C-alpha cells in the first residue's frame, strides 16, 4: 500500500429521506453517491466537504457531523483513498444539478443500492442508525470487493 489522498463524502439526511447525486462524469460515473471529492491543499477536511457539497448540489450547510472514515484500495492504483464521511440535516437552498451530479431525494426504504458503490450497502445501515464507523475496502476494478473490514467506533 502506498500514500493516501484525502477525500470527503457528505450525506444529507432528513427524517425519512436521503439526498444522493447521480455521478455524471469521471470516477464513479453512472452511480448514485453522496457529495464530495478531493480535499484541496490548505483546506481543512470539513471545509473541503462543505465546498464539494456546494459545488455539486448548490446546497450550503450549517453543521456537518463526522460519522465515518473509510480507506479504499483499488488494485493497481498507487494511492489509497482516505474518505471522511459526514452527514448533515441542516441545509440551506434547493438541490440543483451541476456538471458533475444530478441530485435526487430517496426515501430511506428505497435507497438504490444496486446503482451505488458496492461497499455502500455495508456501511450505510450504520450511518442511518447514527453510529460512527471505520472501514477498509479493497476493490478489484469498481465492482468487486476483494476484502474489507468495518467496525463501529466511539469517535471518528
Swiss-Prot record:
Changing residue 155 to A: Reduces 2-oxo-dATPase and 8-oxo-dGTPase activities and increases thermolability. 8-oxo-ATP binds at residues 27, 35-38, 52, 56, 117-120. It holds the Pfam family NUDIX. InterPro entries: 8ODP (IPR003563), Nudix_hydrolase (IPR020476), NUDIX_hydrolase-like_dom_sf (IPR015797), NUDIX_hydrolase_CS (IPR020084), NUDIX_hydrolase_dom (IPR000086). Changing residue 153 to A: Reduces 2-oxo-dATPase and 8-oxo-dGTPase activities and increases thermolability. A motif (Nudix box) lies at residues 37-58. N(6)-methyl-AMP binds at residues 8, 23, 117-120. Monomer. Belongs to the Nudix hydrolase family. This is Oxidized purine nucleoside triphosphate hydrolase. It comes from Homo sapiens (Human).
Amino acid at each position: 500500500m502506498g500514500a493516501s489522498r484525502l477525500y470527503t463524502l457528505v450525506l444529507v439526511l432528513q427524517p425519512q429521506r436521503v439526498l444522493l447525486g447521480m455521478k455524471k462524469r469521471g470516477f464513479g460515473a453512472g452511480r448514485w453517491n453522496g457529495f464530495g471529492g478531493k480535499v484541496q491543499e490548505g483546506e481543512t477536511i470539513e471545509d473541503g466537504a462543505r465546498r464539494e457539497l456546494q459545488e455539486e448540489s448548490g446546497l450550503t450547510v450549517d453543521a456537518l457531523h463526522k460519522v465515518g472514515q473509510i480507506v479504499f484500495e483499488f488494485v493497481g492504483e498507487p494511492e489509497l483513498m482516505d474518505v471522511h464521511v459526514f452527514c448533515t440535516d441542516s441545509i440551506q437552498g434547493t438541490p440543483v444539478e451541476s456538471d458533475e451530479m444530478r441530485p435526487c431525494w430517496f426515501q430511506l426504504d428505497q435507497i438504490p443500492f444496486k446503482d451505488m458503490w458496492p461497499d455502500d450497502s455495508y456501511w450505510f445501515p450504520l450511518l442511518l442508525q447514527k453510529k460512527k464507523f471505520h472501514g477498509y475496502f479493497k476493490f478489484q476494478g469498481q465492482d468487486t470487493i476483494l476484502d474489507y473490514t468495518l467496525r463501529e467506533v466511539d469517535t471518528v
